[in-house]
Amino acid sequence: IEADKKPASMDDATWASYKTTNLSALYQSLGVISMMSNNPADAKTKFEKAVAASATDPVNYYFLGYIADGEYQVTVKAYQASQPGKQRDDLLTKANTQIDTVIDYYARAVAMAESNPQYHAMGAQVRADLETYYKYRHKSLNGLEELINKYKPLTLKP
């Protein structure tokens, strides 16, 4: 599929749909396996490839956010254990960048989940985490809906 070797019996439109759907699902499955194998770096790569193949699946954005959140938590612990100074300041900067990444992935997950009824329950759960992080980072929820709307498919934008 990655090599784009279309079977001779398949027309271009069918192949494009097949490739998009199945390549994304394959990478998503491999990402889940990597997560279960406690290999978040490999999982991240797989979920990024799944998003590249099909950018509308909220599950991939959720997992990317979950992985980024794990990285953020490690940085926060290091920050809390560090002494005042440049290293601590650098850790705070890194943590802020990481939480922004988590917020971005979760906003994408919520936006995509709202576009597909089968993912509405998942979207509501992710939204709760998103709101917590967004409020912590921005001191309010002002601007959150605009961020989510930015990632909604064109047909769902208000």
Could you describe each region identified by the protein language model?
Residues 34, 46-47, 98, 105:
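Alpha-helical solenoid repeat scaffolds, predominantly canonical TPR units
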Residues 23, 56-60, 116:
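Residue-level recognition of tetratricopeptide repeat
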Residues 32-38, 65, 70-81, 94, ...:
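Short coil/turn linking the two alpha-helices of tandem helical-hairpin repeats
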Residues 2-21, 70-108, 112:
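Short coil/linker segments at helix-helix boundaries
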Residues 6-12, 86-89, 93-96, 108-158:
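Terminal, low-structured helical/coil segments at or just beyond the last alpha-helical repeat
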Residues 49-50, 109:
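Canonical positions in the second alpha-helix
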